[in-house]
């Protein structure tokens, strides 16, 4: 590709509204352009990378025995009503009506549509197991789209769905998809880790996420220092306390704390140990009888919202109560809330259930209770695992301790069981002629998100460093002053032709530009191999070669350059 015929829209300056490196570099490299919040156009450089990832995903899915189909992005709302997700999915599901006042949704996922297809097309166990996939645009009306294509409203996804009459074939397909995802990420040249995960709004029994490792990742991965155990922190079980509750040693006292609205301020101003404090968080309840629920965790712990959402009394999806609702129910603001005397259901983390002589808000603005003790000052509350595990705590697997690292989720696989097939009456006749409800699996890969994840893992202060398999171009040709030197122009043109003939994807910078600009663009875009052609090199019978990842420079004889570049890709 000649740059003079190409839309190369690079930028020198880092956009002010781009928070993460991948978003910054995708804008600067001219890969994407924002059309509206969470909506992006893919320009030529970005699209080339996207299509390469898509091709690898398609190859591995086909190899694993999945069959490609294509379903509509616009889906009839009736199908979502059948499964109950029309209401449960929340505002991320974009709902609209056509000119005939019929309800539709823009698909964030396709479980309903695929189940509808299979219940109409498959009626016998002889047609199973069946694994179908598509690569299709999705839409989720994110409340705060951010990080470019990492968390956009519209995105490209590969989603596969499998159907089974028995658990044995379900397990076999799940393992095949697990391996296919591992193969995809390996071929992309990315460091990754599969982890056990929560099934979330999609539901089901077994689930694994695939994370590209990056310091900028939104997800925390908890893994054992001495085994293969790894889980999203949302899923990782915190250890039960090994100690017992100590006897009370002090009376409960009411203390003025006008300037202590956070645990940190309470600890600093009043000298109480953070392990002797609790946080009382008010969340929305699941019933009209209990519209608010209190969740209590230790002051130095973090609430695990996924675990809290699993409480029957808590509304799903999980949502904190707003300040107005809290004041109306309790008479105090969030900085002064505590479990003593609360007129609502109270649930505590296991670590809180063994505390004694602890401090908490007094449900009066600017006041706290110190010296609180269970049974004496407030009734025992049901205890659950409601917190995030902490680095250094024992691993749930029983081997080693927990360490934490950050990752970007790019894939997720589930065993759904009969969640959707039962709701939508997707049944087949088994070998005995009896009707059986289908078992389902679903397997998603964020194709567009993988582009951003690859950049987060592969960049430096000059730009992107693409893994070879997904670089927009493999080789860049930089002819120095070719518009003034016929020798440079002729040799550059010949090399361009030779590399194209060899099946190597080339970006030929034939612009009338300063060498500094040309070098900067090649490094920003992340072309893995760059060949520099100048009169001085030609006099010596050499090309100058530079490797983008290592920064290594070499002089390569003119007649050996094509074979040399072929070898770099092997």
From Swiss-Prot:
Pfam families linked: HGTP_anticodon, tRNA-synt_2b, tRNA_edit
Coiled-coil ranges per UniProt: none
Keywords: Aminoacyl-tRNA synthetase, ATP-binding, Cytoplasm, Ligase, Nucleotide-binding, Protein biosynthesis
E.C. number: 6.1.1.15
Primary location recorded for the protein, binned into one broad class: cytoplasm
One term of GO molecular function: aminoacyl-tRNA deacylase activity
Compartments, as annotated in UniProt: Cytoplasm
Catalysed reactions, as listed in the record: tRNA(Pro) + L-proline + ATP = L-prolyl-tRNA(Pro) + AMP + diphosphate
Subunit structure: Homodimer.
Family as reported in the entry's similarity comment: Belongs to the class-II aminoacyl-tRNA synthetase family. ProS type 1 subfamily.
UniProt name for this protein: Proline--tRNA ligase
Species of provenance: Shewanella pealeana (strain ATCC 700345 / ANG-SQ1)
Gene: proS
């Amino acid at each position: 590709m000649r740059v003079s015929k190409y839309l190369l829209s690079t930028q020198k300056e880092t956009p002010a509204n781009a928070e993460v490196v991948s978003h910054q570099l995708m804008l600067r490299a001219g890969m994407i352009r924002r059309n509206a919040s969470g909506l992006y156009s893919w320009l030529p450089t970005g699209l080339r990378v996207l299509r390469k990832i898509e091709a690898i995903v398609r190859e591995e899915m086909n190899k694993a025995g999945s069959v490609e189909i294509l379903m509509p992005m616009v889906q009839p709302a009736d199908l979502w009503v059948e499964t109950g997700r029309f209401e449960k999915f929340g505002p991320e599901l974009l709902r609209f009506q056509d000119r005939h006042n019929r309800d539709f949704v823009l698909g964030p996922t396709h479980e309903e549509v695929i189940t509808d297809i299979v219940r109409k097309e498959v009626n016998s166990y002889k047609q199973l197991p069946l694994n179908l996939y598509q690569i299709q645009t999705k839409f989720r009306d994110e409340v705060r789209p951010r990080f470019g294509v990492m968390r956009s409203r519209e995105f490209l996804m590969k989603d596969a769905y499998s159907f089974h009459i028995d658990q044995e074939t379900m397990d076999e397909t799940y393992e095949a998809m697990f391996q296919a995802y591992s193969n995809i990420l390996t071929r992309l040249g990315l460091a990754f880790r599969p982890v056990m995960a929560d099934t979330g709004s999609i539901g089901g029994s077994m689930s694994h996420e695939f994370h590209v490792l990056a310091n900028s990742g939104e997800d925390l991965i908890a893994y054992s220092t001495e085994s293969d155990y790894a889980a999203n922190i949302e899923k990782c079980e915190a250890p039960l306390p090994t100690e017992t509750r100590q006897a009370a040693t002090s009376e409960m006292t009411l203390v003025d704390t006008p300037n202590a609205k956070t645990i940190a301020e309470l600890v600093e101003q009043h000298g109480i140990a953070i392990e002797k404090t609790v946080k009382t968080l008010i969340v929305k309840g699941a019933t009209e009888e209990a519209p608010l629920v209190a969740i209590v965790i230790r002051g130095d712990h973090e609430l695990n919202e996924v675990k809290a959402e699993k409480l029957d009394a808590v509304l799903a999806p999980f949502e904190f109560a707003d300040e107005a609702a809290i004041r109306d129910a309790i008479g105090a603001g969030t900085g002064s809330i505590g479990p003593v005397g609360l007129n609502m259901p109270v649930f505590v983390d296991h670590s809180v259930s063994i505390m004694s002589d602890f401090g908490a808000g007094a449900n009066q603005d600017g006041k706290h209770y110190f010296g609180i003790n269970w049974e004496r000052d407030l009734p025992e509350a049901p205890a659950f695992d409601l917190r995030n595990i902490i680095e250094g705590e024992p691993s749930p697997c029983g081997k080693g301790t927990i360490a934490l690292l950050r990752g970007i989720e790019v894939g997720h696989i589930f065993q759904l069981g009969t969640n959707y097939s039962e709701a939508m009456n997707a049944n087949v006749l088994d070998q005995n002629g009896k009707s059986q409800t289908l078992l389902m699996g679903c397997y998603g890969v964020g194709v567009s998100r993988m582009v951003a994840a690859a950049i987060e893992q592969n960049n430096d202060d000059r730009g992107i460093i693409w893994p070879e398999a997904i670089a927009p171009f493999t080789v860049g040709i930089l002819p120095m002053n070719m518009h003034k030197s016929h020798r440079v122009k002729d040799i550059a043109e010949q090399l361009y032709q030779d590399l194209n003939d060899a099946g190597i994807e080339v970006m030929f910078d034939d612009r009338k530009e300063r060498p500094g600009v040309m070098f900067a663009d090649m490094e920003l875009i992340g072309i893995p191999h760059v060949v520099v052609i100048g009169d001085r090199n030609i006099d010596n019978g050499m090309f100058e070669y530079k490797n983008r990842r290592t920064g290594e420079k070499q002089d390569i004889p003119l007649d050996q350059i094509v074979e040399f570049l072929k070898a770099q890709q092997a």
